[in-house]
Amino acid sequence: MKVGIIFIGTNKYADFFQLYYPACEEYLAPTAEKHYIAFTDQDDNEIFQKDRVTVAKIKHYPWPYITLLRFKFISKVLNILEDMDYCLFIDADLIPQSPISLEEIFGDKSLVGVCHPGFINNVGPFETNIHSTAGVLNEHLNLSTYCQGCLWGGRKNDFFQMVKVLSERVDKDLSNNLIAAWHDESHMNRYFAERRNQVHTLHPGFATPEQGYDHIKKEYETKMLHLHKDMKDYPRFEGAGHGRLK
C-alpha cells in the first residue's frame, strides 16, 4: 500500500519537519510505502532533502489564509498523488508518538478525521452563517461529531474529491467576501456532516495537546501529540473569527 502524506510548513513552521518526518517514518503505517509532499516557502532548505519527499513551493500567507487555502494548495498537486492508495494531511506540529497501523488510521471508511479534543461530548463550533458554504444551519446534517482540522484524509479518489469540492467552496466564500469562523476546519466539518457514515473518526488521542487536557491523556492513549507553541513565536492561531471578512 502507498500512502501520500501532506505537510504544510512556511516561515517557522517549516522547522517542524525535522520532527515530523522521522516520527512519521517510524510510527505511521510502518508497513506502507510512504511518500510526502511538503508545501513550504523554503524549498532549498536541506531538512526537506529526504527520501520520498517532494517539495511544492508556496509563499508564506498571513493567518488565516495559510490554513484556509490548504485545499487549493493540495488541489494543484493531485497528479503527484495519483499512484497513492490513501492520502493523509497532518498538521506540521502534530507528531506521531507510537505505532499506528494503516488499518487503525483509515478503518473501513472512505474518509478519516479526528474527534476534536475540546468537543468530545458536546456540539462543536460548526459554522452558523447560512451565507457561507461551510454553514450548517437549515440543513439536515449529522452534527454528532466535530473534528479537528489537524488530521484528515481518505482513500485516494475520495480524498481528491474532498479537496476539489472544498477548494471550490472556499473560493466561492472569498468571492462573496466571507471567511468561515474556523476557516478550513469549518469547511471540513460541513463536508463530513454531509456524509457522516463515510467518515472513520479517530479518538482524541490522535490530536492530544502537549499542554493541558489531562482528562484526554488519562482516557485515551496519546497516539499523536500536538506540540505546544509560544504564540509570540508562532502567531498563527488567533481564534474564531480572526481575519473574517465582513
What annotation goes with each model-predicted range?
Residues 1-69, 77-83, 227-233, 241-246:
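N-terminal anchoring/stem segment of glycosyltransferases
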Residues 10-13, 43-45, 60-61, 94-96, ...:
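Short, solvent-exposed loop/turn segments at secondary-structure junctions
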Residues 15, 45-47, 96-99, 104-105, ...:
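Short catalytic/ligand-binding loop motif for oxyanion handling, primarily in non-cytosolic enzymes
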Residues 67, 71, 94, 181-188:
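Conserved glycosyltransferase catalytic-site signature
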Residues 71-122:
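GT-A fold catalytic core of metal-dependent nucleotide-sugar glycosyltransferases
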Residues 128-144:
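Short, flexible, basic/aromatic active-site loop/helix in glycosyltransferases
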